């Protein structure tokens, strides 16, 4: 099952996920010019869930035609496992995406790179869950962190503002999200779990929206393009690819691959928002790519999970 071709296929899915997420930072920051964080996340996750419903119906009908009448449509998986995974993922996603959206007022590139500090938090938290990490993978993590530093701290000093601290807290939320997916993705249908997580996150965001924000229809209409992009592509497509792509991969390797989402907002911010890309930031991008290449070498193919 853990063949080289399977590893590269899953890696390609996570790289595509990173590209989608990275470009979405621009949409998230633009959307915040018109609506609050809870409104934005309620709308984008509702769209994400609705995007997946036709796929679920289509694949379910295909399974019914191909499976024998007495076969289990969930391959032996209990529905409660699917719902537990989806709801827990949705709660983690709600916490992480809310903190990220509130803290998005920092520069697009900086927000992306601080968020990607989950590449350190995932292996550290994984140790408590008895998931070993090869020394060479730790080396790749250190190289990636060096790249993060070059891109985040452009003046050479380690200074964090209020918005940066919120985004840093969201990195812990995404760490929990990755580890929850690592646990449940081999057990359940990835598309169904993704759909449940979106509706869970949307409901939680909508409750907070009603309590803490005033919804303005005119502002919502002005933000419809960023919401559509973040909802359909970043949420509906991106997070679903994450669940499918993480299946069978070590969570630390998966987090390193997805950390390239931080390179894409820098490039997107440079292209669309005219945020300057210095030689220091370019060096950071190169180090990030080097770390990703390193974990793809043959010596990194082992899963190293302890049962």
Pin down the residues of each PLM region.
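Transmembrane alpha-helical segments that form core, pore/gating elements
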Residues: 48-52, 121-128, 156-213, 241, ...
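Hydrophobic/aromatic residues within transmembrane alpha-helices
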Residues: 31, 40, 44, 103, ...
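Specific transmembrane alpha-helical segments of multi-pass solute transporters/efflux pumps
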Residues: 24-25, 53-114, 150, 231-249
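Juxtamembrane helix-entry segments on the extracytoplasmic side of multipass membrane proteins
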Residues: 6-11, 34-42, 78-82, 138, ...
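Glycine-/small-residue-enriched transmembrane alpha-helix faces in small-molecule transporters
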Residues: 1-43, 90-91, 95, 99, ...
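Hydrophobic transmembrane alpha-helices of multi-pass small-molecule transport proteins
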Residues: 52, 133-153, 205, 259, ...
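Helix-helix packing/entry segments at the starts of transmembrane helices
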Residues: 43, 111-117, 181-202, 235-271
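C-terminal transmembrane-helix exit sites in multi-pass transporters
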Residues: 51-56, 118-139, 263-282
């Amino acid at each position: 099952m853990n063949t080289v071709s399977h590893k590269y296929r899953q890696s390609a899915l996570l790289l595509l996920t990173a590209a989608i997420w990275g470009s979405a930072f621009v949409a998230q920051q633009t959307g915040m010019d018109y609506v609050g964080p809870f409104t934005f996340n309620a709308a984008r996750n509702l769209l994400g869930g609705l995007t997946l419903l036709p796929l679920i119906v289509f694949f379910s009908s295909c399974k019914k035609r191909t499976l024998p009448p007495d076969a289990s449509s969930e391959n032996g998986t209990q529905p409660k496992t699917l719902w537990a995974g989806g709801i827990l993922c949705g709660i983690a996603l709600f916490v992480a995406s809310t903190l990220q959206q509130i803290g998005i007022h920092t520069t697009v590139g900086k927000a992306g790179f601080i968020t990607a500090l989950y590449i350190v938090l995932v292996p550290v938290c994984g140790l408590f869950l008895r998931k070993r990490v090869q020394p060479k993978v730790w080396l790749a993590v250190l190289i990636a962190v060096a790249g993060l530093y070059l891109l985040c701290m452009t003046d050479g000093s380690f200074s964090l503002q209020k918005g940066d601290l919120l985004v840093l807290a969201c990195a812990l939320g995404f760490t929990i999200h990755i580890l929850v997916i690592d646990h449940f993705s081999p057990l359940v249908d990835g598309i169904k779990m993704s759909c449940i997580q979106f509706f869970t996150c949307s409901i939680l965001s909508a409750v907070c929206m009603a309590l803490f924000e005033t919804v303005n229809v005119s502002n919502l209409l002005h933000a419809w393009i960023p919401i559509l992009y973040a909802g359909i592509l970043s949420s509906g497509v991106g997070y679903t690819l994450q669940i499918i792509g993480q299946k069978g991969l070590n969570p630390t390797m998966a987090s390193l691959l997805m950390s390239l989402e931080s390179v894409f907002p820098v490039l997107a911010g440079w292209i669309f928002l005219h945020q300057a890309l210095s030689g220091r930031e370019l060096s950071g991008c190169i180090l990030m790519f080097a770390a990703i290449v390193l974990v793809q070498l043959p010596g990194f193919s082992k899963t190293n999970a302890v049962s």
